[in-house]
């Protein structure tokens, strides 16, 4: 989809709320967009998205904003790669929640929603207490 857009920097809100988008987002969706920075609300509210392909964002180290990226994608299942760690998105870790707030809010069918996804990222895990929040 974005193969011929090597200078792409932002897809903020591009497909937000589009019910027609269904299935898996390919793991290599942004493989040619190594400089992409802003994915805020990219597919937020797209209830038809069911999963992320292997390696999603693995080669996109310039990402600085995933605010509400998958907010409300309530049919996503499986285990999400830990984009909240330095390994995946080194420029958005830390305490500036405006860059990642509620990225996975409402994605409660994810296998690691309660066990790994931090509450500030929209998950149910509280790193401070080491416990999931109900």
Model-predicted regions and their roles:
Residues 1-134:
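Negatively charged
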